[in-house]
Amino acid sequence: MRTLWIVALLLVGVEGSLLELGKMILQETGKNAITSYGSYGCNCGWGHRGQPKDATDRCCFVHKCCYKKLTDCNHKTDRYSYSWKNKAIICEEKNPCLKEMCECDKAVAICLRENLDTYNKKYKAYFKFKCKKPETC
């Protein structure tokens, strides 16, 4: 089952420490990262590009910008450690870059939770060709 989860995340193109990011999103929102955010709006999941469609999509846009600031680690392949204590994500990494990557993922998971009321099903499987030119970070 764990292998299927990792393969599914790879197929939708979610970046970062895939397993950790997916778990954070589930813990914070109660939603499955793949089915709920894998192709949401213009910026969530694979093919992310374009003006955010709503606050939920903006969370993903800001997340991509956060990743662009990482310098000494690879957000597509490197993994980090975190824990879930008292309903809070705790980034436990000693490596500064991996800690920052964890903080990027933590921030998007919290942002998605804080914007659950903006989640719009019409953007769930949004066609990326409809997206307008992206703004810069």
Curated annotation (Swiss-Prot):
Assembly information from the UniProt record: Binds to heparin.
Disulphide bridges, residue numbers: 42-131, 44-60, 59-111, 65-137, 66-104, 73-97, 91-102
Protein name, per record: Basic phospholipase A2 homolog MT1
Expression tissues: Expressed by the venom gland.
Subcellular location: Secreted
InterPro entries for this protein: PLipase_A2 (IPR001211), PLipase_A2_Asp_AS (IPR033112), PLipase_A2_dom (IPR016090), PLipase_A2_dom_sf (IPR036444), PLipase_A2_His_AS (IPR033113)
GO function term, MF aspect, one: calcium ion binding
Keyword vocabulary terms for this entry: Disulfide bond, Heparin-binding, Myotoxin, Secreted, Signal, Toxin
An example Gene Ontology CC term for this record: extracellular region
Region (Important for membrane-damaging activities in eukaryotes and bacteria): 121-133
Organism (species): Agkistrodon contortrix laticinctus (Broad-banded copperhead)
Gene3D superfamilies: Phospholipase A2 domain (1.20.90.10)
